[in-house]
Amino acid sequence: MKSFIKTSLIYFFIFELIFQFLIFFNFKFIKIPDLFYNGYCDQKYWNFNEREILFNSETEYHPILSYVKKDLAVPKSLKDSFLIEDNNFESNKISLYGSSYLNHKEFKLLINNNENLNYKNYALNSYGLDQIFLSYKLTAHLNQNRTIIFGFLLEDLDRSIFYNRDYEKVLIKNENSEFIITNTPVNIEKKNSSSFDFYLIKFLSNFKNLIKNDFDPRLDKCHISKKEDLLNYYINEILKTSSKFNQKLVFITFNLKEDLIKKPTWRYETTKKLLKNSSIIHVDSYALLKNKSQSNLDEINTYFGDDKHNNKKSFEYIIDDLFRKL
């Protein structure tokens, strides 16, 4: 028995040294974050990640949101808000807040077909739900008496627990039941630095969790309480702010194709229940597309593009449902 333990420890030490050597000298075939970490759970996944997102010339630096669209003049401070004493609601004016789904070229082309509506679109690729929420808080006073549409992938919630993903970003922390905005002003020039780790242990632990979660890292319920607390905070703050500025709220939730093929993750029921309890209009793309497809796999495959986002066909269904509910 002692001999077995000794031999095991020696092999463990050897394999760990091999991992350390390969990673230190940046061998690409082994320096893959998915081998060691879960991108929905571990900050080290993103510290380990060498991928960078490239924005076009239409975006610029922002000290809280990291990046914003240049043409929208987003205030740089949450203290810049003011209230106009005018409750004349303008039903033809809409402001959009979200991530890559509401900023998708197919979505924008379709929604702009309605010439009777006037749009402002604050959505930006890569935004987490925290950045979506803060983009609204920063500009809510500029969009009084309007319909406000939030649209996000359910997994955008997970981005809220990280201070860095494809770039350095804001982090909202819950400290003694008070939510604090940290890591601002954001330093987008800051580079990720991989800290030391025991990679063999991380590899084995990650592999075990992948088996447990049917090789879908989204199914892991890591930090679920923190994520649910943040979601509740966002919704409650949005409700208070929208009431102050006489705004009508609509939420569109998007799902990955895997949710339609198998079943949605815990995020779906959590978000759906919270929106229902808050009496918020909800365009539920999962329920809509599930019903349209009648769970037919071939039909489901026609709803998504090569970029894993919805395509023109499914965006049309979603936008039709949106306009029915406005």
Predicted segments, located by residue:
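Loop/turn elements at helix/coil->beta-strand transitions in domains of secreted/extracellular proteins
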Residues: 117, 144-148, 243-249, 278-280
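Membrane/wall-proximal cationic-aromatic binding patches
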Residues: 27-114, 292, 301
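Hydrophobic membrane-insertion alpha-helices, especially the h-region
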Residues: 6-23
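Generic structural signal for small/hydrophobic residues in well-ordered secondary structure
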Residues: 99, 132, 148, 242, ...
